[in-house]
């Protein structure tokens, strides 16, 4: 997602990165999420948009949103960043057998209330999301939760492997 300028920053943030990386603990859990999805829908697969993120990239993201209404969607690097900066968070969705992402109501990286998971029934009721899109989000959360990940309330695509406190105690920040 950040290897192209088609993201909320409008910039390429990863020049030569072609693969996503996670801390092994999170990667093993993600394998379990993929297995859970395959048990339910054998033709579906998880698709990763972002995973481990160096603090240098976090600073670039923060500089785009600081002082705007979008600041709440990006972890402040001056406060230790977020779990992406430990390799313990993943931005993810589900794709079908043709490699097409399932509709989720918004694109990944869409920083607005429509991306929040806290009132999806209201979004359906107000015509901002279809029931199919809501069910797709629920499926994603189900398989990720089963594997031990926690959803971020403001971004349907973002899942944390552990809490920030655990990350600070047990893992190393990526500079």
What are these regions (language model features)?
Residues 159:
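Conserved metal-phosphate-binding beta-hairpin within the catalytic cores
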Residues 1-51, 61-154, 162-175:
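Extracytoplasmic cell-surface/polysaccharide-interacting catalytic and binding patches
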Residues 54:
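Segments that shape or occlude catalytic/ligand-binding pockets
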Residues 57:
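Short, well-ordered surface patches within globular domains
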């Amino acid at each position: 997602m950040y290897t192209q300028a088609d993201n909320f920053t409008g910039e390429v943030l990863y020049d030569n990165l072609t693969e996503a990386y996670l801390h092994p603990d999170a990667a093993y859990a993600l394998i379990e999420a993929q297995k859970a999805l395959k048990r339910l829908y054998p033709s579906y697969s998880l698709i990763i948009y972002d995973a481990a993120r160096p603090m240098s990239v976090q600073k670039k993201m923060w500089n785009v949103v600081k002082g705007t209404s979008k600041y709440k969607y990006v972890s402040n690097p001056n406060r230790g960043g977020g779990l992406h900066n430990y390799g313990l968070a993943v931005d993810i969705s589900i794709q079908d057998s043709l490699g097409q992402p399932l509709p989720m109501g918004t694109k990944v990286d869409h920083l607005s209330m429509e991306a929040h998971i806290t009132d999806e029934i209201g979004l359906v009721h107000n015509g901002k999301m279809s029931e199919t899109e809501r069910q797709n989000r629920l499926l994603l959360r189900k398989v990720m939760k089963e594997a031990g990940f926690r959803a971020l309330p403001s971004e349907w695509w973002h899942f944390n492997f552990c809490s920030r406190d655990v990350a600070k105690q047990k893992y190393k920040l990526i500079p």
